Structures are given as structure tokens and as C-alpha cells.
Amino acid sequence: MSKISGTLEWAVANANCITGCRHDCVYCFARYNACERFKNVEMGDWPKEKVNWKNAKKRWSKIDGTIMFPTTHDITPNEGELKTLDASIECLKNILKPGNDVLIVSKPHIECITKICKELAVYKDKVLFRFTIGAMDNEILKHWEPNAPSFGERFDCLQHAFKAGFKTSVSSEPMLDSDGVIQMFDMLEPYVTDAIWIGKMNNVRQRVKVQTAADKKYVDMIVKGQTDARIREIYETLKDDPKVRWKESFKTVLGLELAEEAGTDK
């Protein structure tokens, strides 16, 4: 039986409509694949987003299981003639129109989430937001996710979607600050209707280049914060909370049963 990991833990299919991502996250698998592994894009060009309108306008049929959007970019505000938010909303509407269930995953901008909640209100029962929040410390976030929103803005987005009546969840994969993860869980949990996922930063030594003292500091922090012993400590603290979920990277360490079917979101 093939291993169920990554996005397949959450969804059976995915959709994207933008190339590149202005957030330029240091650990990003899509950035690594495009710029390092396959060398399709220069590293300096990755933050220069380009809309794929063919994908945005694609007509979807109904499928069994959840569709995740996006997986290789994020949902970012329009910038002049670069209509990334408009493209994302058009793509989402086309997925939702046939009755599909959609998981929207983002390091969210309040401008984007406010508009998405308004535009997709009629599809509310088919949408689950999953906001990526790996730490509360903005210094840590700024190092790993240099152009993504602050913790405060992401927290505002979570509260906005929750108060607008949408289903909400959080992904703390990668967990960027293991020392603060319990406090963050407790702070976010009241605004989460679904679950808070916690997972390791995968392939950190492979994907992250250590070129400065700051790079070394933060890589060492990640490695120290996701040892087997630390993972077990976090598990023991949170295991009885009904809203906690463990990604495959944690389950492997903990000896928990792995997903056997794509898109079970468990």
C-alpha cells in the first residue's frame, strides 16, 4: 500500500492557478522543486507571481472527496494589473459550482479572507479554511516566511472566518517554534471548528541553505524543536484535546496509525 502523506492526508485532488509565490517561504517544497530540483525557475524569480488564467477558468465536474486549493502558491492580494486574488476566487468558484468540497489552505491576508468570505458565502457549507500558523513570534515567522502576514493578521483572519460562519482549522506544519506551540494552540483553539494540525518541517537540511549565522540559528532551533523526545512531550500535553491532529511526520515518531486512504483528513 502506498504511503499517504503531504497534501494527500487532507485531500484527494488539488488545484492551483498561479506560478511562483510572493511569500517566498524558505522551506517551501514548491519553491525547492521549481528552483533547485528541476531548475524551472530562477530563485530570484520565484516571488514574481504569474496568473495562469487557463487554470483559474477551468470548469470542474463533481468528484468524490475534498479538493485542496492552493498547494504550490498562496492566495495573495491583487497588485495593480496582477490579479492574483481575483484569479484565486474565480478558480474557487469554478471548483465549488458543481458541489465539490474545498479545503482552502493559506498564510492568510485579511484583505483576501474578507473578500473570499463575502464571495463564497453561498458555498459556506462546502468550504473549510486551513490557515497556516507555525509560530506566534513574528521574528521567527519573518525569517522563515519573509513576505507572509504577521501572526496578528493571521489570527485576525481566523477570527473573521469563524465569525462569518465558515468552518475553520489551522495547520502548524511546519511547527516553527516548539517552545510556543502549546500556548499558540490554546490561543487559536476557540476559533477553530475543525482541527489544529501539527507537523515537522520536512527535509530541513535538504531544502534550507545555511548561509548566515541567522540561518544556522533558526535551523538549529527547528532541529532541536522536533526531536523525537520533544515530539513526545507535545503529544503528551495535547493528546486528549479533541481538536488536535498529528501530521504523518509526528505519527511516525509516535507510532500512531497512518492514513490508508487519501483525503480522510484524520
Regions found by a protein language model. Name each.
Residues 17, 21, 87, 247:
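Functionally engaged cysteine thiol sites
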Residues 27, 208-211, 257-259:
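Short aromatic-enriched loop/helix-cap "lid" or pocket-rim segments at secondary-structure transitions
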Residues 1-66, 253:
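N-terminal [4Fe-4S]-dependent radical SAM core
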Residues 52-237:
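Conserved AdoMet/S-adenosylmethionine-binding subsite of the radical SAM
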Residues 229-266:
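C-terminal accessory regions of radical SAM enzymes
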Residues 33, 37-40, 81, 116, ...:
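Short linear functional motifs in flexible/disordered or boundary regions
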